[in-house]
């Protein structure tokens, strides 16, 4: 990491940045509300964007095999998650992917569950799609968030939940869920036929010895009902590039997602 600059603080007040737009008249106001870091871009990424701009026309493109392979290699090397090219779908962002899944696997009025508090676009996206929002409240124990699994099961049964939008690692609480916790979630979803979306956009930022487990690595049976969402945007601080990917290992779920996107 020594070759990267984590010291220089760029002035972003005049760069039309969403994070700092409210600070133009108050430069001493600290903006800590969004996952957008004030580090200089990684030189290799910056140069790749410059090279592309100099060599290419900005028309419709297809996804090269090397891009799929980069995702395959990253997931295997960083998280022990083995996937195939045909299981990867690229999309503009995690939130648009959640919206696609809501439309593909639920009908208007169906119940969609989240663990609150959680990243606020989850609830907004569910409501904008005219679905019933079910909030399973996280409990604060031992200084961090925990899931009340009895209440989770009760919420799913009483509301006939069809879809569960899960955040792993958790935003904003920072919880890196254990494999045992993920196992319990998966067993409940399997028991009641709930499709789970696991937003793992912060998967590479597990710190202080904590290990992130991609949901589908915990139990092979989870691949039948879970959609994994991830992106390079948080890891490399490139949210403005609008890129993410979904990993769908159940072909039937994959086809339904594709139909909704078309």
Mark where each language-model region is.
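Conserved core of the PLP fold type I
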Residues: 58-187, 204-205, 211-221, 227
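Conserved core segment of the aminotransferase class I/II
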Residues: 47-48, 219-220, 224-261
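A general structural signal for well-ordered alpha-helical segments in protein cores
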Residues: 42, 46, 67-69, 182, ...
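Residue-level marker for buried hydrophobic side chains located in beta-strands
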Residues: 168, 196-197
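N-terminal small-domain helix-loop-helix segment of the aminotransferase-like
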Residues: 2-93, 100
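Walker B catalytic acidic pair
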Residues: 200
């Amino acid at each position: 990491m020594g070759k990267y600059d984590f010291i220089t603080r760029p002035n972003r007040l005049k760069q039309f940045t969403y994070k700092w737009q409210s600070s133009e008249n108050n430069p001493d106001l600290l903006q800590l509300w969004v996952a957008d870091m004030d580090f200089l871009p990684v030189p290799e990424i910056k140069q790749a964007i410059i090279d592309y701009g100099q060599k290419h026309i900005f028309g419709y493109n297809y996804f090269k095999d090397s891009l799929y392979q980069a995702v395959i290699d990253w997931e295997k090397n960083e998280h022990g998650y083995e996937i195939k090219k045909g299981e990867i779908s690229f999309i503009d962002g995690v939130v648009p992917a959640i919206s696609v899944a809501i439309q593909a696997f639920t009908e208007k009025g169906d119940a969609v569950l989240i663990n609150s508090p959680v990243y606020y676009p989850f609830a907004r996206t569910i409501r904008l799609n005219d679905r019933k929002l079910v909030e399973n409240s996280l409990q604060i124990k031992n200084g961090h968030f925990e899931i009340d699994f009895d209440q989770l099961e009760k919420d799913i049964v009483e509301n006939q939940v069809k879809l569960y939008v899960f955040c792993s690692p958790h935003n904003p609480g920072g919880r890196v869920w254990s494999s045992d916790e993920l196992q319990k979630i998966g067993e409940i979803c399997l028991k009641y036929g709930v499709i789970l979306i696991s937003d793992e956009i912060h998967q590479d930022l597990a710190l202080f010895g904590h290990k992130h487990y991609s949901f589908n690595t915990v139990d092979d049976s989870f691949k039948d009902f879970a959609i994994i969402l991830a992106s390079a945007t948080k890891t490399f601080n490139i949210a403005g590039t609008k890129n993410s990917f979904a990993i769908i290992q159940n072909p039937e779920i994959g086809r339904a997602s594709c139909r909704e996107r078309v």
